[in-house]
Amino acid sequence: MKTTYTSKAARAALALFTALPTSTAYAANGTFFYHSPQSGDLEMEDPDNGECRLLLQGADSALNQTDTKATLYFDQGCEEPAGTLLPGQSKSFGAPIPHSVQFG
């Protein structure tokens, strides 16, 4: 009977584990603020982790008020890193300015 109980517990744990979403499914909690030279102050609320997000007309400054690191990129496709902002960090950028961001 002990083997049956252990087996049931193991199957239940496995079912629970496989039902959990992967890390890319999570959203960063909080707001990412940035300033675009042409568009002014903008923000992203609870952005998805792992998704490359366009910064409208680029960002000359950014503030990461999410609970996840934000990696900024000079290009629009998240391929040319411009720097990383940990939760609570901010940064101003000179030329060239970042044009995309990815969380996680």
How should each PLM-predicted stretch be described?
Residues 2-104:
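Compact beta-sheet-dominated domain cores in extracellular/mature segments
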